[in-house]
From Swiss-Prot:
Name of the protein described by the UniProt record: Bifunctional protein HldE
Gene source species: Pseudomonas aeruginosa (strain UCBPP-PA14)
A GO-annotated cellular component: cytosol
Gene: hldE
Family: In the N-terminal section; belongs to the carbohydrate kinase PfkB family.
InterPro entries per the UniProt record, alphabetical: Bifunc_HldE, Carboh/pur_kinase_PfkB_CS, Cyt_trans-like, PfkB_dom, RfaE_dom_I, RfaE_dom_II, Ribokinase-like, Rossmann-like_a/b/a_fold
Length: 474
């Protein structure tokens, strides 16, 4: 799936749901308490982060989209901390504050990046559902997507009023569901349960086929536009009416903490859809975002630059013509998997059998082959007027179609030395009958410990000779 970064700055999203404060106490542990067999934590640092629906809004704002938030809090220090954090992040938060109840707080005691204890300060909110609905309806005209972030804490009490109000304005409704009754989300455009939540409703699924069948049945029963089941290390599955299931593998490189991963999925989905992305592309972006956030500790947001880098990395993982930035990310990923990078370069004006044989031999020197291609101006300087015969785009497209070639990139200079300094291949390969020291860029590669190898060329195979022969016959 080809992904691109949306224009998030043109994506207003309204989030409604259970806001909470995620509070972290960090400290050192060096002894066991004499009072009970538990570690003693000497608190050295504390931090507050928006959680629940507030984290969804924070993620949307971090992507550069416009985030509006409606939720319920107490009238206390925790609510003030939430409001200040959200304002600093650019979230337009509208809280219904209740004097008689505390803001929901999840306190986590941490030591050496490990969670030792979680303490919850909460009681279900008794909200004025009608007043909250009025607040939501007054904001719908300003947004392109509505998100219901439901943690079952009481902020959302009349889901259908909100869903129908949005549908009347043709505004998509995304819901992150909780509980044992998904009927309250009837008519939503998309719901995003995790596998455990999904199986609580439909029963255990023995395999993907059963998951798809039960999901399609649930969609029809509840008049849902689509269903996205997040499946942890197995990725996620998107179901739509009349379309085959779309299974996306997990993209996490390292997993430190799954806290807030569901928030990241629905926030990225909402922002992407509000920016005009089609649903499959939005799901692809959400999958990448989830892979990033589980590599962070605690409740965390991802930024637009982080997601853009992941998109570029995803594009770079595919074979073909790449820009330099995408190529460097692809190389980084390949090296993370222990792959050896081989580089060669040339004009490749008219591809012939000698080129193909040479590139196959070059590919055999490692795991990934990069071909650097002179752009049109540099070919003219090197080969003279009338060259190249084929433009750089055409030359790169042909090279990218060869099985031996992984990535193709162009360069504007007469030699690839500047490109070599950035790519830093493990092996530099050149065809010819000269010594290693005569290879352009050899000193650069050898200076950082790389290898330089010279391969023999196929006899009677020359682009210049082919061009001359064509001219003589023409």
């Amino acid at each position: 799936m080809k992904l691109s970064m949306p224009r998030f700055d043109q994506a207003p999203v309204l989030v409604v749901g259970d806001v909470m404060l995620d509070r972290y106490w960090h400290g050192a542990t060096s002894r066991i308490s004499p009072e009970a067999p538990v570690p003693v934590v000497r608190v050295e640092q504390h931090e507050d982060r928006p959680g629940g629906a507030a984290n969804v809004a924070l993620n949307i704002a971090a992507l550069g989209a416009q985030a509006l938030l409606v939720g319920v809090t107490g009238r206390d220090e925790a609510a003030d901390s939430l409001a200040n954090s959200l304002k600093a992040a650019g979230v337009d938060a509208r809280f219904q504050r209740i004097d008689s109840q505390p803001t929901i707080v999840k306190l986590r005691v941490m030591s050496r990046h490990q969670q030792l204890l979680r303490v919850d300060f909460e009681e279900p909110f008794r909200t004025d559902a009608a007043a909250l609905a009025v607040d939501v309806e007054s904001l719908l005209a300003k947004v392109k997507v509505l998100v219901l972030s439901d943690y079952g804490k009481g902020a959302l009490q009349n889901h259908q009023v909100l869903i129908q109000a949005a549908r009347a304005r043709n505004i998509p409704v995304l819901a992150d569901p909780k509980g044992k009754d998904f009927a309250i989300y009837r008519g939503a455009s998309l719901i995003t349960p995790n596998l455990s939540e999904f199986e609580t409703i439909v029963g255990r699924c023995a395999d993907e086929a059963e998951l798809v069948a039960k999901g399609q049945e649930l969609m029809s029963e509840l008049d849902l536009g689509a269903l996205l089941v997040t499946r942890g290390e197995h990725g996620m599955t998107l179901l739509r009416h009349g379309q085959p299931a779309l299974h996306l593998p997990a993209r996490a490189r390292e997993v430190f903490d799954v806290t807030g991963a569901g928030d990241t999925v629905i926030s990225t989905l909402a922002a992407a859809l509000a920016a005009g992305e089609e649903l499959p592309s939005a799901v692809g972006l959400a999958n990448l975002a989830a892979g990033i956030v589980v590599g962070k500790l605690g409740t965390a947001a991802i930024s637009a630059p982080e997601l853009r880098r992941a998109v570029q990395r995803e594009q770079g993982s595919e074979r073909g013509v790449l820009g330099l930035e995408q190529l460097l990310l692809a190389i980084e990923d390949a090296r993370a998997h222990g792959e050896k990078i081989v580089f060669t370069n040339g004009c490749f004006d008219i591809l012939h059998a000698g080129h193909v044989t040479y590139l196959e031999q070059a590919r055999a020197q490692g795991d990934r082959l990069i071909v650097g291609v002179n752009d049109d101006a540099s070919v003219t300087r090197l080969k003279g007027v009338g060259r190249p015969i084929n433009s750089v785009d055409r030359r790169m497209a042909v090279l990218a179609g060869l099985g031996a070639v992984d990535w193709v990139v162009s360069f504007a200079e007469d030699t690839p030395e500047r490109l070599l300094e950035q790519v830093r291949p493990d092996v530099l390969v050149k065809g010819g009958d000269y010594g290693v020291e005569q290879v352009v860029g050899a000193q650069i590669v050898k200076a950082y410990g790389g290898e330089v190898r010279v391969l023999g060329l196929v006899e009677n195979s020359s682009t210049t000779a082919i061009v001359e022969k064509i001219r003589q016959k023409g």
